[in-house]
C-alpha cells in the first residue's frame, strides 16, 4: 500500500495509517 500512497503524495511516517 505504501507504493500507492507515494504515487500521489509524499510518504508520511508520522501518519501511515491515516493515508490508508
UniProtKB/Swiss-Prot annotation:
Keywords: Chloroplast, Plastid, Thylakoid
UniProt KW Plastid keyword: yes
One cellular-component annotation, GO: chloroplast thylakoid lumen
Location of region: Disordered: 1-20
Primary location group: plastid
Compartment annotation: Plastid, Chloroplast thylakoid lumen
Name assigned to this protein: Thylakoid lumenal 20 kDa protein
